[in-house]
Design a protein with these regions (language model features):
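Acidic/negatively charged segments and metal-coordination signatures
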Residues: 1-366
């Protein structure tokens, strides 16, 4: 009845007991799950959430010192010498999914989190930047003022995923190339060659990024004078002034509902605020991680889907899908409301859908 040494939070008898040693994650250091939970606890302690601080107060009071402490702790959790491959789950027979798509707290709840209920374990890449891999002038540890808004996004992302991480439904993994420079170089080279051989564009992804960028500017300029905000948006997006005024008024009417509105004056200086737009893992890393972990690739990104489709094996120029008809029949899965509200997987009909997907996966593998 002891807890398993792999750090899953489960009993040994229901976790690694029947898993061959070579397919287990390491027991000698803290697991990915344990590091993520430690990071979330540290965030809550530093920001005073554990003592009752509200999110509104945090947006008003977030300090450079808090940002430095949070990212410094993250860099300690994930040093450069981390043996990431010993920490990643292996292809051990569990029905595992790997999400590849837009990593933003405003979009992760749309598809990535809801679909996690269908898998034994669901992998999502963390959007948190590791300061160990940055030059000092770009690091949140040495330039925290530039990271005030990005820190809000990172903090909220972690705290909203924390319950799913705690229950073992979602494993928030770092990019393996952060700890393997040769891998990173190879990935960048392959990505460069692929992008120059064929250009892929997707209007839906582009539309989301445009809306996100407008939202980011609205959130970070919330306390600026109206004329300054109008000028910034007009110049940034080449929008009509009347259209910009309408956008700002609509935002201001609901500013209390915007969980990312920075409720303190921006004082980032001449360097401005750092804002990250992240889609990950990239195509090459997605294929590598899915093979290493034995994961089904899951995406809601039109761009990533096109990349995956373009890479399919072709016979005489045509792509054939042996399982196409059957997979197209499984085009709708039920939403697990209990999973989204109480972080517990529903049984019954949803359990049947879960088992069906597992069987299809096994049939294809066999």
């Amino acid at each position: 009845n002891d807890f398993c040494g792999c750090g899953s939070g489960k009993k040994y008898k229901t976790c690694c007991l029947r898993t061959p040693i070579e397919l287990r994650t390491t027991w000698s250091v803290a697991s990915i799950r344990e590091r993520n939970l430690a990071f979330c606890k540290f965030i809550r302690d530093v920001l005073g959430i554990s003592k009752g601080k509200t999110w509104k107060q945090i947006r008003q009071e977030l300090s450079n010192e808090q940002i430095v402490d949070i990212y410094k702790f993250y860099s300690i959790l994930w040093p450069r010498e981390t043996d990431i491959y010993s920490l990643l789950p292996k292809s051990d027979g569990r029905f595992r999914g790997l999400y590849t798509g837009i990593l933003d707290v405003r979009s992760i709840h749309k598809n990535a989190i809801p679909v996690a209920t269908m898998f034994d374990e669901f992998l999502i890449e963390t959007p948190i930047i590791n300061p160990n891999n940055l030059k000092p002038e770009f690091s949140p540890i040495t330039s925290p003022n530039q990271y005030k808004y990005q820190a809000l996004k990172d903090i909220l992302f972690m705290l909203q995923l924390e319950p799913y991480i705690n229950y073992g439904h979602i494993n928030l993994i770092p990019d393996p190339s952060e700890f393997d420079l040769e891998l990173k170089k190879a990935m960048i080279d392959m990505s460069y060659q692929r992008r120059h051989s064929i250009e892929i564009k997707n209007t839906e992804d582009h539309k989301f990024y445009l809306q996100t960028m407008i939202g980011d500017l609205l959130n970070t300029t919330a306390l600026m004078p109206l004329e300054v905000r109008i000028k910034i948006l007009v110049n940034a997006f080449k929008l009509d002034k009347d259209q910009v005024i309408e956008i700002i008024n609509e935002f201001d009417n609901d500013i209390q509902k915007s969980s990312l509105a920075l409720l303190q004056p921006s004082s980032s200086g001449k360097d401005g605020l750092f804002m990250q737009y992240c889609m990950g893992p990239n195509y090459e890393m997605t294929l590598l991680i899915s093979q290493v972990t034995g994961s089904v690739i899951v995406t809601d990104s039109g761009l990533r889907w096109q990349e995956l489709m373009n890479a399919q094996h072709r016979t005489h120029g045509l792509t054939t899908y042996p399982w196409n008809k059957m997979l197209n029949a499984i085009n709708v899965i039920p939403q697990d409301d209990q999973f989204l509200e109480k972080f517990l997987k529903t049984q019954g009909k949803i359990s049947k859908s879960r088992e069906l997907l597992k069987k299809v996966d096994q049939m294809i593998l066999n």
